[in-house]
């Protein structure tokens, strides 16, 4: 079956639609449910967590939600400029899988009595620009950005799992499934030919990540 060729206007509208769905609460629906995400009968609900723990977990999930917003933007930006069709399709498929993470984080934030970060539009725009630029430089570098981004996300998730109370089974199940998926995305991008990024680029990405985590935990 021949793939339908989209006009530049169609592509622009599709990107705009994705941005609106990513940034508008309640518009992203998960296709999957993370394993063991439903609390056990004796597991504490969000409202029964001590207030300091609830605030901390809420801040962590806000960070993770913004991270998924950035992932959506990064993949969409790369897909918009990737030269090889199979690379573009891989970016779009990864973005669809990340939509589950976005929905899970948003739902958990609501359960904890919070709202997503107000800085999401800013980080979406920045990440889209990074993704589009990476795609223009070349597909190997674009895949390298994916690998490095996912590896950094995995480190964040491991840190958050260490901080989330053992009794908060729902949050932990979400983070565990996200970690599994992100590792898969990193390996897939590397195996597809992702280049190792220069040390200055990796350090710059780490610095940007630190700015994101510091601000979105609070705002």
From Swiss-Prot:
<keyword id="KW-0560">Oxidoreductase</keyword>
<feature type="binding site">
    <location>
        <position position="98"/>
    </location>
    <ligand>
        <name>Fe cation 2</name>
    </ligand>
</feature>
<feature type="binding site">
    <location>
        <position position="150"/>
    </location>
    <ligand>
        <name>Fe cation 2</name>
    </ligand>
</feature>
<feature type="binding site">
    <location>
        <position position="98"/>
    </location>
    <ligand>
        <name>Fe cation 1</name>
    </ligand>
</feature>
<comment type="pathway">
    <text>Cofactor biosynthesis; ubiquinone biosynthesis.</text>
</comment>
<comment type="function">
    <text>Catalyzes the hydroxylation of 2-nonaprenyl-3-methyl-6-methoxy-1,4-benzoquinol during ubiquinone biosynthesis.</text>
</comment>
<dbReference type="GO" id="GO:0005886">
    <property type="term" value="C:plasma membrane"/>
</dbReference>
<keyword id="KW-1003">Cell membrane</keyword>
<keyword id="KW-0479">Metal-binding</keyword>
<keyword id="KW-0472">Membrane</keyword>
<dbReference type="InterPro" id="IPR012347">
    <property type="entry name" value="Ferritin-like"/>
</dbReference>
<dbReference type="GO" id="GO:0006744">
    <property type="term" value="P:ubiquinone biosynthetic process"/>
</dbReference>
<dbReference type="Pfam" id="PF03232">
    <property type="entry name" value="COQ7"/>
</dbReference>
<dbReference type="GO" id="GO:0008682">
    <property type="term" value="F:3-demethoxyubiquinol 3-hydroxylase activity"/>
</dbReference>
<feature type="binding site">
    <location>
        <position position="68"/>
    </location>
    <ligand>
        <name>Fe cation 1</name>
    </ligand>
</feature>
<comment type="similarity">
    <text>Belongs to the COQ7 family.</text>
</comment>
<feature type="region of interest" description="Disordered">
    <location>
        <begin position="21"/>
        <end position="51"/>
    </location>
</feature>
<keyword id="KW-0408">Iron</keyword>
<dbReference type="InterPro" id="IPR011566">
    <property type="entry name" value="Ubq_synth_Coq7"/>
</dbReference>
<keyword id="KW-0831">Ubiquinone biosynthesis</keyword>
<feature type="binding site">
    <location>
        <position position="101"/>
    </location>
    <ligand>
        <name>Fe cation 1</name>
    </ligand>
</feature>
<feature type="binding site">
    <location>
        <position position="182"/>
    </location>
    <ligand>
        <name>Fe cation 2</name>
    </ligand>
</feature>
<protein>
    <recommendedName>
        <fullName>3-demethoxyubiquinol 3-hydroxylase</fullName>
        <ecNumber>1.14.99.60</ecNumber>
    </recommendedName>
</protein>
<dbReference type="InterPro" id="IPR047809">
    <property type="entry name" value="COQ7_proteobact"/>
</dbReference>
<feature type="compositionally biased region" description="Low complexity">
    <location>
        <begin position="35"/>
        <end position="46"/>
    </location>
</feature>
<dbReference type="InterPro" id="IPR009078">
    <property type="entry name" value="Ferritin-like_SF"/>
</dbReference>
<dbReference type="GO" id="GO:0046872">
    <property type="term" value="F:metal ion binding"/>
</dbReference>
<feature type="binding site">
    <location>
        <position position="182"/>
    </location>
    <ligand>
        <name>Fe cation 1</name>
    </ligand>
</feature>
<feature type="binding site">
    <location>
        <position position="185"/>
    </location>
    <ligand>
        <name>Fe cation 2</name>
    </ligand>
</feature>
<keyword id="KW-0503">Monooxygenase</keyword>
């Amino acid at each position: 079956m021949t793939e339908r060729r989209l006009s530049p206007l169609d592509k622009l509208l599709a990107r705009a639609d994705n941005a609106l769905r990513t940034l508008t609460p309640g518009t992203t629906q998960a296709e999957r449910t993370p394993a063991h995400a439903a609390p056990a009968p004796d597991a504490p609900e969000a409202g029964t967590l001590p207030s300091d723990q609830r605030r901390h977990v809420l801040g962590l999930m806000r960070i993770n939600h913004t991270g998924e917003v950035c992932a959506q933007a990064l993949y969409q930006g790369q897909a918009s400029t990737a030269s090889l069709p199979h690379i573009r399709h891989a970016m779009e498929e990864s973005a669809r899988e990340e939509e589950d993470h976005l929905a899970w984080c948003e739902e958990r934030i609501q359960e904890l009595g919070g709202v997503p970060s107000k800085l999401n539009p800013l980080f979406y725009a920045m990440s889209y620009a990074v993704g589009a630029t990476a795609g223009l430089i070349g597909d190997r570098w674009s895949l390298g950005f994916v690998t490095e981004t996912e590896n950094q996300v995995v480190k964040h998730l491991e840190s958050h799992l260490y901080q989330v109370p053992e009794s908060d089974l729902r949050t932990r199940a979400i983070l565990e499934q996200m970690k599994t998926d992100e590792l898969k995305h990193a390996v897939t991008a590397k195996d597809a030919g992702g280049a190792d990024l220069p040390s200055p680029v990796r350090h710059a990405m780490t610095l940007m990540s630190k700015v994101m985590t510091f601000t979105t935990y609070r705002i």
